[in-house]
């Protein structure tokens, strides 16, 4: 409780004339962590994609465009304008859910030379940091009133042994969705952080 009260005090100072606050530092750490994860996601995806034949790339991309990511079930802003209109707490809550949805699937991410075994722990660290920011911005609001939405079904065929073609498709889907979701979280946290500085231009 003392930690939450302290963080609430810190975040309230974010609108004052002080150039840097502890609240902003917490946001900076979270943004830095998700930027790193987004870079890892991009590297994993592009290294995997470059290992495919041109026709395989074309077919998988076509299938992915017709498919959807599990995390699409998490209600989030549909465009940059809605993102900019969303409250800090809403952006943090969506980010938390997106990060949490990848803690288990990230363990099976493959491709390239990126440190795959470190992804899940880094997601857990990021989730913990976002939770601190949520607690600091709650102001008495219930954390996740629609908690049932947090329970997402596993990715299709996630627990099954697959043939070569289906395994290729699942890997492509996981990497593409992971990259997409880390980009979302990076955007949401960056906008939320910007809101702490009233003079800042938070245009996407």
Curated annotation (Swiss-Prot):
| Compartments where located | Secreted
Record-listed Pyrrolidone carboxylic acid modification sites: 18
Q: Which residues bind Zn(2+)?
A: 36, 186
UniProt protein name: Somatotropin
Summary of the function given for this chain in its UniProt record: Growth hormone plays an important role in growth control and is involved in the regulation of several anabolic processes. Implicated as an osmoregulatory substance important for seawater adaptation.
Disulfide bonds, which pairs? 69-177, 194-202
Return the InterPro entries for the record.
4_helix_cytokine-like_core (IPR009079), Somatotropin (IPR034975), Somatotropin/Prolactin (IPR001400), Somatotropin_CS (IPR018116)
This protein's major location comes to secreted
Could you state one GO biological process linked to this protein? positive regulation of growth
Q: Tell me the Pfam families matching this sequence.
A: Hormone_1 (PF00103)
What does the UniProt keyword field contain?
Disulfide bond, Hormone, Metal-binding, Pyrrolidone carboxylic acid, Secreted, Signal, Zinc
Q: Where is the signal peptide?
A: 1-17
Which SUPFAM superfamilies has this protein been placed in?
4-helical cytokines
Q: Which Gene3D superfamilies match?
A: 1.20.1250.10
MF terms from GO for this chain are: growth hormone activity; growth hormone receptor binding; metal ion binding
Q: Which GO terms describe its cellular component?
A: extracellular space
The similarity annotation says: Belongs to the somatotropin/prolactin family.
């Amino acid at each position: 409780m003392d930690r939450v009260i302290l963080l609430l005090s810190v975040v309230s100072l974010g609108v004052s004339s002080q150039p840097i606050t502890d609240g902003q530092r917490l946001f900076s750490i979270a943004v830095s962590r998700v930027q790193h994860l987004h870079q890892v996601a991009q590297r994993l995806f592009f290294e995997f994609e470059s290992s495919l034949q041109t026709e395989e790339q074309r077919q998988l991309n076509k299938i992915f465009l017709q498919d959807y990511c599990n995390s699409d079930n998490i209600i989030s802003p549909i465009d940059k304008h809605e993102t900019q209109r969303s409250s800090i707490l809403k952006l943090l809550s969506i980010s938390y859910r997106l990060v949490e949805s990848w803690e288990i699937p990230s363990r099976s991410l493959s491709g390239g030379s990126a440190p795959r075994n470190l992804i899940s722990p880094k997601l857990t660290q990021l989730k913990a940091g976002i939770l601190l920011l949520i607690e600091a911005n709650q102001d008495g609001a219930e954390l996740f009133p629609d908690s049932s939405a947090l329970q997402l079904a596993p990715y299709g065929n996630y627990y099954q042994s697959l043939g070569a073609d289906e395994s290729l498709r699942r890997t492509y889907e996981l990497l593409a969705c992971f990259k997409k979701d880390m980009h979302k979280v990076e955007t949401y946290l960056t906008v939320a952080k910007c809101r702490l500085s009233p003079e800042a231009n938070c245009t996407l």
